[in-house]
């Protein structure tokens, strides 16, 4: 547990670690397969539960604000305890990472099925659900088949596009 964020440290002691950020409908334990591979390369893996996932089913919303706060807690710990820190992130975890870590000195990043254009994804969700921008602004929250559409979240992603990412990255 790191500052009330449930976490697992996988692998034998090393000066290298991967911060493992899972995707939607996942949890920290799903890092086990990745951690086994990373360990063969001499790396530990630090995985954790995002809000509304794993041990945090009754916690805050899993949104960019809470996700980024958790990622910063985890990275602060990682950079304080390992010499070489890399990143593995999946889906929404990659989007949160793009927001939280754009200026962090990660050695490298591995993105698995990353969400890199959240604005496009939300606009598609609105289209699929028959929701207009005006309707979302008026109602503030509208359930959809994928997830709840939220006006504040939509406004955040429009005003905070990902414009910089200087970490060497591979898309898996």
What is each PLM-predicted segment?
Residues 15-23:
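Short beta-strand element of the alpha/beta-hydrolase
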